[in-house]
């Protein structure tokens, strides 16, 4: 049995062809080389597999032969099992000038022939996410540096050494191809995949913020002894309200109004009232309580329609609607009651400058509130440093949002959504990158989704999300049909930096 068993059959074109063999040796997503008689070697990928028996009808769904017919065929010397042939549909990965030549032989590729398809960078500049499935034969021909990099847990929970090509994500290319989406239904391996991505960022000491609403992203307990590295000095877990908060005197008037808006949408009249007051006086109060007293005093002067020693009525009566100001005060009072101003964010900023990953935990409500400040503050700090180069140093950062639809949902009108959208569009210029994980891809704001250059697609079955995948990725119709049936941990990776979709499996995580 050799590679000459595979030949191109039937009608072909420049996009796809069919290959026939008497031996069932190919699987979905395997890579093959068509040795085109006139155009040379053409790289292809298996997208469909079919089995045909020459003794049976092949053009109807209910084709079969009876036991009696089989016995008659055997009696005259026919072997039914030898009548089976295998047909494979191949999608062309190269760009041939002409249709593939019928009758061409087909063989399996070697590593050097296919390396460009998988890898855009070196191992030291890449994240080791998992393995590229169905590449065992190619793995045998790859250099030693690509071998024994990780372990894999199969669908039966058994751990294996690496036997297929490693999937490497070149994170240095995120300047050109920014932002990552990780999507999958419940039990698909989406959260596990997110854990592995964060582990890899920690290995490379990439400063990272993780908003963790499920309080599960802790990296202390090892999966296997002597597997992976010790992350204990590479991350910190901080809780909003206990370890993290907002230092009120550090806020400018734009940051403060964004925080107030988290407690309820502000009308134009409310914004005008706030801006009129802050246009006359910047935030000079030393605390949130002092600022509340300041607003309350102005409101009382406007309600009483008379001046006192402050002169607030004369200064603001023509500029500020008292009802709008009172609405702002009610929202600010609710903000004050969250205790968000009892701590500072200094621990966050210092950890990021040290190249650490910061896991931020809390209720979804508190995470949304704190994210509206922290995400904006980190982005502005990095932007000021890049633009001015004289500002205080602030590093390149990744911002990870688990359950991202709760931070930037398409049906939300929130400060956090607005900031995330801005980073999605402008962040790459400043070295600020997003990683959004969600069970509901279709629920995320569409402009943000469109800016994700790499998408990890785990098992998904809801029609709305499948439709979003059709629109926002380059998965083929065959791959989308397979999505509801993927095993836990199997994933399609749609990656702009290599211009291809790969079928992969997430590696065994170093931690639990």
Enumerate the predicted regions with their spans.
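Conserved catalytic network of the ASCE P-loop NTPase/AAA+ motor domain
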Residues: 174-175, 200-204, 351-352, 388-393, ...
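Conserved ATP-driven motor cores of ASCE-family P-loop NTPases powering translocation/secretion/packaging/pilus
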Residues: 423-504
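Basic- and hydrophobic-enriched, low-structure N-terminal and domain-boundary segments
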Residues: 1-183, 193, 197, 393
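P-loop NTPase motor domains
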Residues: 215-225, 244-422, 429, 486-497
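Hydrophobic "anchor" residues on beta-strands that sit immediately upstream
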Residues: 208, 398-399, 435
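Conserved nucleotide-binding/hydrolysis micro-motifs of P-loop NTPases
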Residues: 51, 94-96, 214-218, 243-244, ...
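Glycine-rich phosphate-binding loop of nucleotide-binding enzymes
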Residues: 139-239, 446, 480, 493
């Amino acid at each position: 049995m050799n590679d000459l068993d595979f030949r191109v059959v039937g009608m072909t074109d420049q996009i796809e062809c069919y290959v026939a063999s008497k031996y069932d040796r190919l699987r979905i997503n395997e890579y093959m080389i068509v040795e085109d008689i006139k155009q040379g070697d053409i790289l292809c990928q298996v997208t469909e597999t079919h089995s045909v028996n020459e003794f049976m009808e092949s053009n109807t769904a209910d084709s079969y032969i009876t036991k009696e017919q089989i016995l008659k065929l055997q009696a005259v010397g026919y072997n039914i099992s030898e009548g089976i042939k295998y047909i494979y549909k191949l999608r062309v990965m190269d760009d041939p000038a002409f249709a593939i030549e019928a009758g061409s032989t087909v063989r399996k590729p070697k590593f050097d022939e296919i390396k460009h398809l998988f890898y855009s960078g070196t191992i030291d500049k890449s994240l080791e996410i998992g393995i590229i499935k169905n590449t065992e034969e190619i793995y045998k021909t790859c250099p030693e540096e690509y071998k024994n990099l990780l372990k894999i847990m199969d669908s039966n929970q058994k751990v294996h050494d690496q036997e297929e090509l490693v999937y490497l994500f070149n994170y240095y290319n995120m300047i050109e191809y920014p932002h990552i989406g990780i999507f999958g239904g419940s039990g698909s391996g989406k959260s596990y995949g997110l854990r592995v991505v964060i582990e890899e960022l920690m290995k490379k000491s990439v400063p990272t913020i993780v908003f963790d609403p499920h309080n599960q992203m802790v990296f202390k307990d090892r999966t296997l002894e002597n597997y992976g590295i010790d992350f204990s000095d590479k991350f910190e877990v901080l809780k909003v309200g206990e370890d993290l908060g907002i230092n009120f005197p550090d806020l400018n008037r734009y940051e403060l109004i964004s925080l107030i808006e988290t407690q309820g949408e502000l009308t134009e009249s409310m914004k005008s009232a706030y801006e009129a007051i802050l246009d006359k006086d910047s935030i000079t109060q030393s605390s949130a309580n002092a600022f509340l007293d300041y607003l309350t005093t102005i409101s009382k002067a406007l309600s009483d329609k008379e001046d006192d020693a402050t002169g607030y009525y004369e200064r603001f009566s023509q500029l500020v609607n008292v009802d709008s100001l009172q609405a702002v005060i009610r929202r600010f009072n609710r903000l004050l009651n969250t205790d968000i101003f009892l701590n500072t964010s200094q621990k966050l900023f210092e950890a990021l400058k040290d190249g650490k990953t910061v896991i931020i935990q809390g209720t979804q409500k508190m995470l949304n509130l704190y994210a509206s400040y922290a995400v904006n503050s980190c982005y502005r700090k990095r932007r000021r440093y890049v633009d001015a180069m004289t500002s205080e140093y602030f590093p390149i950062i990744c911002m990870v949002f688990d359950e991202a639809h709760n931070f930037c949902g398409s049906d939300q009108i929130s400060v956090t959504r607005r900031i995330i959208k801005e980073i999605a569009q402008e962040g790459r210029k400043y070295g600020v990158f997003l990683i959004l994980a969600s069970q509901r891809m279709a629920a995320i704001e569409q402009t943000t989704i469109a800016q994700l250059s790499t998408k990890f697609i785990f098992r998904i079955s809801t029609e709305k999300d499948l439709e979003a995948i059709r629109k926002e990725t380059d998965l083929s119709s065959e791959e989308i049909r397979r999505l509801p049936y993927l095993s836990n941990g199997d994933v399609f990776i749609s990656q702009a930096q290599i211009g291809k979709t790969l079928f992969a499996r997430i590696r065994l995580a170093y931690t639990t």
